[in-house]
Amino acid sequence: MHIFNFLLFYPIFMSIYWIVGSIYYFFIKEKPFNRLLLVKSEHQQVEGISFLLACYNESETVQDTLSSVLSLEYPEKEIIIINDGSSDNTAEIIYEFKKNHDFKFVDLEVNRGKANALNEGIKQASYEYVMCLDADTVIDDDAPFYMIEDFKKNPKLGAVTGNPRIRNKSSILGKIQTIEYASIIGCIKRSQSLAGAINTISGVFTLFKKSALKDVGYWDTDMITEDIAVSWKLHLFDYEIKYEPRALCWMLVPETIGGLWKQRVRWAQGGHEVLLRDFWSTIKTKKLSLYILMFEQIASITWVYIVICYLSFLVITANILDYTYLKYSFSIFFFSSFTMTFINIIQFTVALFIDSRYEKKNIVGLIFLSWYPTLYWVINAAVVIMAFPKALKRKKGGYATWSSPDRGNIQR
């Protein structure tokens, strides 16, 4: 009976936790700071930022990203782009672009993964603060100012992660992911921030303190998701990570089922790799915030496998001629579906209300509010089934290379 209660109520509990955490974070930590009030004076002293752009087969997007960073008003900056052995004409495009623009270019011959590319790029960084961007990303002009200001206020910060938005919204998948980032992922980051530890920075857009990266050994070349891995290392070394929702960037997301599936399996595998690697180190820290974060990861994996076992049991023992059995099963299904739908409506309403100060058009996402979070749990369950065995087979000490990304329909 206890297992059944966990199966039924865990998603509901987590949704309520995200809702309450988001509301509290918004009114206490987010709303008091109006995103429109930011002083940018020519005489204002700012810390220098080294922008790192690691890319692999980004011939269609890299020029847009370079142009975006070069055009930023941020006064003290340098740009370092790393080509990680691309098999397309990415290197040629960068060399041609460099003829008329000032930036550093590290051209690696062999694809050894994003983490290795970032490790090579940071060797060229002149400043204490390092902004890591994906090569399909366009950032708002205000974003670096918001993020660097957070470091001034809190010397314990090791990283400030921004608020990614979706550029390509022409397809159904693009629209769904737009709402997902605005609601579910935003809720999770806000609630985790309150607990004191964020599971992962946004690999697409984060500002690091270089000395903090040096302390933790920079990025791990053998972890499939370098962003999750470095996030946990920062926590273990007593650095804090801040979520800065006012710092916006615009990125491309997969617009094919295959591309989206591959991305989500990689994310889940990376999270599981980190959990397996850092489990005992986390236990030894005796930090409640990390215990909460680790419990959330373990509980999610456990929930998935309980679902599999329970559904298998139902199929094996089902008696379609037993009216009492069918009535009981239908009652449980109806209750859980009604409860989840009700919670989903509240979660989406709260999340999209909060998000409307950054992107008002997302309010149309209300049409998804009765069903998408439920689908989110189903997708995550399927992803975990594929990803966890992969994480168990991770080869230590190698290079987690990357493949050509699915960037969807690029909208300029």
Curated annotation (Swiss-Prot):
Pfam families found in the cross-reference section:
Glycos_transf_2
Q: What is the top EC class of this enzyme, as a single word?
A: transferase
GO cellular component terms attached to this protein's record: plasma membrane
Q: Where in the cell is it found?
A: Cell membrane
- Residue ranges of the TM segments: 7-28, 298-320, 332-354, 364-386
| Topology in the lipid bilayer | Multi-pass membrane protein
What EC number(s) does this enzyme carry?
Answer: 2.4.1.-
| Phenotype when changing residue 106 to A | In strain: 97-337
Query: GO terms for biological process?
Result: cell adhesion involved in biofilm formation
Looking up InterPro entries in the UniProt record yields:
Glyco_trans_2-like, Nucleotide-diphossugar_trans, PGA_PgaC/IcaA
Annotated keywords: Cell membrane, Glycosyltransferase, Membrane, Transferase, Transmembrane, Transmembrane helix
GO MF terms on file?
acetylglucosaminyltransferase activity
Primary site of residence: membrane
NCBIfam families named among the record's database cross-references: PgaC_IcaA
Stated role: N-acetylglucosaminyltransferase that catalyzes the polymerization of single monomer units of UDP-N-acetylglucosamine to produce the linear homomer poly-beta-1,6-N-acetyl-D-glucosamine (PNAG, also referred to as PIA), a biofilm adhesin polysaccharide. Requires IcaD for full activity.
What the record says about family reads:
Belongs to the glycosyltransferase 2 family.
By what name is this protein known? Poly-beta-1,6-N-acetyl-D-glucosamine synthase
Can you name the source organism?
A: Staphylococcus epidermidis
